[in-house]
């Protein structure tokens, strides 16, 4: 019979147990001890060594708080994905400098956990100074609608420059790549798009796409 826990307390205990095993496995491996190969634990070694972040799927405020608490307990790098009820605990997220990917916002509440899905969290984050990025959770919402999401957030009252950063610089920061991409600065990769107008307007087209200084796309006018 499946004896997996059906409560949030039980799920948190499972996560903590897995991380504790990974912590012990990593310590023994680094000490050169003879250990039995475990592919699941091996996948967590880079997480325990802070080489990679652990991505936490969370919608509800209580789940977000639990995720932050457990990650801090083990001293992990982490990112929070979805963060639907983040607007309820803005100060807590800001205090912990948590990296958040908010969304998909252009989607109905498909379950109890995300029934509060709308643009309250991005607006609250923007006003409080939380540097978050948007996610469409492709293929829930197609990735091409990312800039549309940012544009709608502006219509709700989000600062336009912050909305643009939420799909560029802050997205790069979320992936740990802001030293290379996300903004036009000396020393970064020459990756950018030339738009026909405001990139946050759905009527705007991408005219030219440049990757590492090379033009890889030019729009043909029909």
Regions found by a protein language model. Give the residues of each.
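A general structural motif
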Residues: 36-37, 56-60, 81-84, 111-119
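Short acidic active-site motifs
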Residues: 43, 88-89, 121, 182
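Active-site-adjacent beta->alpha loops and helix N-cap segments on the catalytic face
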Residues: 85-95
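Short aromatic-centered micro-motifs
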Residues: 209
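Polyanionic/metal-chelating signatures
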Residues: 1-78
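His/Asp/Glu-enriched, well-ordered alpha-helical/loop segment
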Residues: 53, 94, 103-107, 111-197, ...
């Amino acid at each position: 019979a499946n004896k997996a826990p059906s409560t949030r307390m039980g799920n948190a205990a499972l996560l903590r147990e897995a991380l504790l095993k990974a912590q012990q496995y990593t310590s023994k491996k680094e000490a050169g001890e003879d250990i039995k190969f475990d592919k699941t634990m091996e996948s967590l070694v880079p997480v325990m060594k802070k080489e990679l972040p652990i991505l936490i799927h969370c919608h509800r405020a209580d789940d977000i708080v639990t995720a932050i608490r457990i990650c801090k307990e083990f001293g992990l790098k982490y990112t929070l994905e979805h963060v639907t009820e983040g607007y309820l605990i803005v100060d807590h997220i800001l205090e912990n400098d948590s990296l958040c990917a908010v969304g998909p916002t252009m989607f109905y509440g498909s379950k109890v956990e995300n029934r509060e899905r709308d643009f309250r969290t991005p607006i609250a984050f923007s006003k409080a100074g939380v540097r978050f990025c948007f996610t469409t959770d492709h293929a829930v919402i197609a990735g091409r609608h990312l800039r549309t999401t940012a544009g709608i957030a502006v219509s709700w009252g989000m600062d336009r420059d912050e909305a643009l950063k939420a799909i560029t610089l802050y997205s790069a920061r979320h992936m740990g790549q802001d030293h290379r991409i996300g903004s036009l600065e000396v020393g970064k990769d020459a990756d950018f798009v030339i738009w026909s107008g405001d990139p946050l307007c759905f009527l705007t087209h991408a005219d030219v796409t440049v990757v590492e200084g090379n033009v890889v796309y030019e729009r043909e006018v029909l």
